[in-house]
Amino acid sequence: TALDDVSFTVEEGDFVGIIGATGSGKSTLITHMNGLNQPTSGKIYIDGRDLWAEPEKIREFRFLTGLVFQYPEYQLFEETCYKDIAFGPRNMGLDEAEIDRRVHEAADFVGLDPALLERSPFELSGGQKRRVAVAGVMAMRPRILVLDEPAAGLDPEGRDDILSEVKEYHKKTGTTVLLVSHSMEDIAKYADRVLVMSNKKIAMYDTVENVFARAPELLALGLSVPQVTKIFLKLREMGVDVPADVYTVPYAVKMILEAKKRRDAGESLVLPRVDAKKGGAATC
C-alpha cells in the first residue's frame, strides 16, 4: 500500500509544505493530485468535483494542477527556451498572442532574462534550466502548483532565488501551492501550513507554528527541525524561559529582543522546574 487512510483539505490560496522521511508516501501523494495515479479506493476532489468521476475528462483536471518533478530540467527538449515554455499553453489550444503573453509572464515570474528565450535551454546553467522548466508549468496558469523538491541540487543562492520566486508567484496570483521538501528551513520560511507524512499516513497537518512546536514528535518520526528551533529547544533544556515554537531567524531575533527587554526590566528568564519529591514547581 503506497498510501493508507490519507484524508486532508487544502483551501484555495494555501501554501502547504509536505515533509516526511524517504518512503513516507510524499511523491505518491502528489502524483495523485493531477491524475497521474488513480487511487484504488477513496476519492480526490478539486473544487468539489471528483477527479475520477468521468475518466474521459481527466485531461481537463491535469491543466488545473501543474506538477513540477524533481530535476525538471531533465525534461526540457525544445530548440529554444521560448518553445519549451510555450509547449504547455500550446497544448491547451491557446492562440499565439495568448501563448506569447504567458511565456513572457512566466519567464518574468522565475527571473529568466528575456534575452535567453531564443537560446537553447541546453546552453544554460543548471539554475537557469530549472527556471525554464518551472516557467513551462507556470505558463499554463494552473489553479494548483505542486513542486517536488524544486531546489534540489542547487547552490544556496540558487535555492533561495527559485523558492522566493515561487513564493512571489503565490502571492501575486493567489495560486494554491504544495511544496515537497526535505529542508525544514525552506518549509518554515515559505509555507503557511505543513503536512507531515509517516509510514504512508498523515502524522500531522497544521500551521507551521503548531507543527514545529511539536519538535520532539518530529524528531521521533526521523525528521529534523529548523536549526533555530533546535537552538531554542536547547535553551529551554538549559532552563531559559524562551518559546519552543521558534522556527525562523526573524522570529528568533524578535524573541531574543523580547527576552532581553524582560531581563532588563528585572524579570527572571529562568524556567520553573518541577520538584520530583514534592510534585510542585521550584525555581532554578
Residue ranges with predicted function:
Residues L145-D148:
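Catalytic Walker B motif of ABC-type/P-loop ATPase nucleotide-binding domains
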Residues S120-L124, Q128:
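Conserved ABC ATPase signature
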Residues A97-A115:
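Conserved ABC ATPase "signature" region
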Residues N34:
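Helix-to-loop junction immediately C-terminal to a conserved catalytic motif
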